[in-house]
Regions:
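N-terminal leader/signal peptides at the extreme start of proteins
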Residues: 1-10
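Extracellular beta-sheet/turn segments enriched in Thr/Pro/Gly and aliphatic residues
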Residues: 152, 229-258, 262, 331
């Protein structure tokens, strides 16, 4: 008698299904392992950043109060405004902001009662950045530093910088640069407005028309102060700020988001006219006697008769033809 034997095995489809399942499981395990590594790296970098910030705060707590300030800052001191520090092969950018704070328990500068020494305490803010770290967000740490002795009347003043948009609304987190090369030591500050669109520089050294202020950031227009020499001898509409002893100087700068102007040059048959030369001028003045316009530039359309200007601020603009062949008929 012949006995028929059957051999157990896998068909091609079963083999493919098994291989697919094994591959899916392997990918899942690998992805989970990779995610664990990412989380561990994030925890490690945050721990390093936190330790670095605590180290900086401890240094500040142990230096004389008069030295608690930034190099070329207000208040002036021994702490660098920016510094790169390497820890465990990670390069961290350490930014230090130190501001004089005016508390209202003894009055405020310009208030009632008037505080003739408004620099009551110093607010220290340390930001730790890491460009090479994955899944890392900038960490910020703050601390308040107070003097041991009773304050005396200040011989300095205050500069309050307000930033608003075209609708008069305050603009928070606007980048502010403040420079004064006439003082000893010089002042060079990079900071931001608060939630109310204000940056208060308290206990600033007195100086006449020498505090240069600029407000602006990516995607926004820039507004700044000027000296007469910056604009060819005209009188600045927004001159460099003056700070007087025990007085508050208030400066308002208006900024808004950048816009785009698209210009096309065509003839009477609506055919493109290439390389058309024209002048584009806004109405905003940065100087008078004689007038100096904030935007006053000569431009030309492309060979296809078009031009796009993408870094334009809000204003009313006038087009004046300066082309040797064509004139402007309508708009």
């Amino acid at each position: 008698m012949n006995m028929m034997r059957t051999k157990a095995g896998l068909t091609l489809i079963e083999t493919l299904i098994t291989a697919f399942l094994l591959m899916a499981i392997s990918i899942g395990i690998f992805s989970a392992f990779r995610q664990i590594l990412v989380v561990m790296e994030s925890i490690r970098t945050r721990s390093l950043a936190t330790a670095l910030a605590n180290e900086r705060l401890e240094i500040i707590r142990n230096i004389p109060y008069a030295s608690v300030g930034t190099v070329s800052g207000i208040p002036a001191g021994v702490i660098p405004q920016e510094e790169d520090v390497i820890r465990n092969n990670y390069t961290f950018q350490v930014q230090t902001f130190i501001r004089n704070i005016d508390h209202d328990f003894d009055g405020t500068a310009g208030g009632f009662p008037n505080d003739t020494s408004p620099a009551d305490n110093k607010l220290v803010e340390i930001r730790i950045l890491c460009d090479q770290c994955q899944n890392y967000r900038t960490l910020a740490f703050t601390a308040m530093v107070a003097p041991k002795n009773v304050e005396s009347a200040s011989t300095n003043g205050s500069l309050f910088i307000y930033v608003i948009d075209a609708n008069g609304e305050p603009v928070s987190n606007m980048d502010i640069t403040l420079d004064n090369g006439m003082l000893i030591p010089e002042v060079h500050i990079n900071d931001q407005t608060n939630v109310d669109g204000v940056l208060q520089i308290i206990d600033a050294p007195p100086a006449v028309s020498s505090y240069e202020v600029t407000a602006g950031k990516s995607g926004w227009t820039e507004n700044r102060t000027y000296s007469s020499s910056d604009i060819g001898g005209s009188i600045p509409v927004f001159p460099h700020a003056t700070v007087l002893q025990q007085q508050i100087t208030q400066l308002t700068l208006v900024v808004d988001r950048l816009s785009t102007i698209n210009i096309e040059s065509v003839d009477e048959f609506c055919a493109p006219v290439g390389d058309f030369d024209f002048n584009l001028r806004g109405t905003k003045l940065i100087g008078t006697t004689p007038d100096v316009y904030k935007y006053d530039q000569s431009n030309a359309t492309s060979l296809g008769g078009s031009l796009s200007l993408s870094t334009i601020e809000w204003d009313t603009y006038t087009i004046t033809p300066i082309d040797s062949t064509y004139d402007l008929v309508g708009s």
